[in-house]
A protein has these predicted regions:
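N-terminal glycine-rich FAD/FM-binding segment characteristic of electron-transfer flavoproteins
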Residues: 1-149
């Protein structure tokens, strides 16, 4: 399943939330690449184990619309079906933009996920972590907001 992981730069490095998603994607053997968003000129986000595209945004603007447009183009051109981001302000904004662009709902509060016969199965936390439920996502484009551990 072709996958896009949306990451962020934190203090010059790829965020821990993105690294968690990358590790899980590698564990599942997903074909993925990372799009990293940040305001820095030369962040330390390289890796030999995955492709990374750095999207520099303007730190004086609140809107991530231009970044979302670039991500939409990536998803379209590469036939990506699974898009994931850490549950941060940037991750939530970008997943929201993309889910509207592709008319597909997002699943939030994901604490774990698996792939079964081309579908994504998520475990989600609700009620402050007191309850957990599972979702089976069958849509063409699957949008997940992953809660950090």
């Amino acid at each position: 399943m072709k996958t896009l992981i949306i990451g962020e730069v934190v203090e010059g490095n790829l965020s821990s939330g993105a690294l968690e998603i990358i590790a899980k994607s590698q564990e599942l053997g997903l074909e993925f690449e990372v799009a990293t968003v940040g305001t820095e000129e030369s962040p330390n986000i390289g890796s030999e184990s995955f492709k990374n595209t750095y999207l520099k945004c303007n730190e004086t603007q609140l809107s991530l619309g231009s970044v979302a447009n670039t991500l939409k183009t990536m998803v379209d051109e590469q036939s990506i079906s699974l898009i994931m981001a850490p549950s941060t302000y940037v991750g939530r904004d970008l997943i929201a933009f993309l889910s509207v662009d592709f008319s597909s709902s997002q699943v939030s509060n994901v604490i774990n996920f698996s792939i079964e016969e081309g579908n994504v199965i998520t475990s989600n936390s609700i009620n402050g972590g007191e309850s957990e439920y599972n979702s089976k996502i069958t849509s063409d484009k699957k949008f997940l907001l992953i809660r950090p551990k």
